[in-house]
Design a protein with these regions (language model features):
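Short alpha-helical oligomerization interface
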Residues: 114-129
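The beta1-alpha1 cofactor-binding region of Rossmann-like NAD(H)/NADP(H)-dependent oxidoreductases
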Residues: 59, 80-93
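N-terminal Rossmann-fold NAD(P) dinucleotide-binding loop
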Residues: 38-39
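Non-catalytic terminal and boundary segments that flank Rossmann-like NAD(P)-dependent oxidoreductase
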Residues: 1-29, 96
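Flexible cofactor-recognition loop at the NAD(P)H-binding site
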Residues: 35, 104, 110-113
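Conserved glycine-rich cofactor-binding loop
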Residues: 27, 34-35
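Conserved glycine-rich Rossmann-like NAD(P)H-binding loop of the short-chain dehydrogenase/reductase
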Residues: 48-64
Length: 149
């Protein structure tokens, strides 16, 4: 078996990883795409030509981020949509509202361990619901769109 290697390291940026890749005509969703790693990922995808949907808990705050990305990348195809991956009803709505094919799904949103026990409305532990269950539901809910691409 041949070992797979890469020149990328822990210090590599999203822009370095995607350099030379043309994503024109591709659509991506990035959960938590308005901050942190999600922001850098969204910006790199847009710079490579992808249309990107920022799926975020706070759409009002994300709109300014989306505008920043539009201006800095020259890519106007950045939209913001409400999604709380810890809330399965929100995930179901997001999936039901999605139209068209989807080539890229970046399940980025996440939370760190909480000091106290917090549960979702459905009774799930918050970190499990956010970091695993919601993304599993999102991926399975968007499966048809991913396959259509």
């Amino acid at each position: 078996m041949e070992r797979i290697t890469t020149n990328f390291r822990s210090s590599s940026t999203a822009a370095e990883v995607i350099e030379g890749v043309d994503l024109s005509g591709k659509h991506a969703i990035v959960t938590g795409g308005a901050s942190g790693i999600g922001f850098k990922t969204t910006k790199a995808l847009c710079a490579a030509g992808a249309a990107v949907t920022l799926a975020v808990r706070r759409p009002a705050a994300a709109r300014a981020v989306a505008e920043n990305i539009r201006v800095s990348t020259g890519n106007a195809a950045v939209e913001v949509r409400s999604l709380d991956v810890s809330d399965l009803a929100s995930v179901r709505r997001f999936c039901a509202d999605w139209t068209g094919p989807l080539q890229i799904l970046i399940n980025n949103a996440g939370i760190m361990a909480l000091q106290d026990l917090h549960r979702t409305l459905e009774g799930w532990e918050m970190q499990f619901a956010t970091n695993f269950l919601g993304h599993f539901a999102l991926t399975t809910g968007l499966h048809a769109a991913l396959v259509a691409a």
